Amino acid sequence: MKLQSLSIFSLLLLLTACSVRENDLWLQKAEQFYADKQIDSTLTYLNRIIPEKLEGEDVYTYWRIQFSTSPQPFIRHSAEKIEKLSQHYEKTKDTINLKEINHIRYRLFLYNQAYDKADSMLQIIEKRA
């Protein structure tokens, strides 16, 4: 009887552990989706206000590739460009573009938070595995 109850208890623990892991993975995917949406809108905005070309690609394509390989340099580069544009708009007293720049600063802040959270969740999941 004890052996049978022990195996049922073990099975319940295993199912609970698998369920928790699935929930963590679902949450991680949801946060990554949110982060991707943030980054897509940021890249679209950057491409609209900074219409430069890089190696035959538009800014959106170039930075999307850069982001997928290493997100932190993307955030740093975007923040630097946005700061320069912000200073330019402040000097020219262009309030419409300044308002948009402040909005994109906020988006970068949110993205950075989402990236940090997804990264820490990934580390937790890797420790459990």
Language model segments and positions:
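Sec-dependent N-terminal signal peptides
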Residues: 5-15
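N-terminal secretory signal peptides that target proteins for export/translocation
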Residues: 1-2
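A "functional boundary" signal
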Residues: 18-129
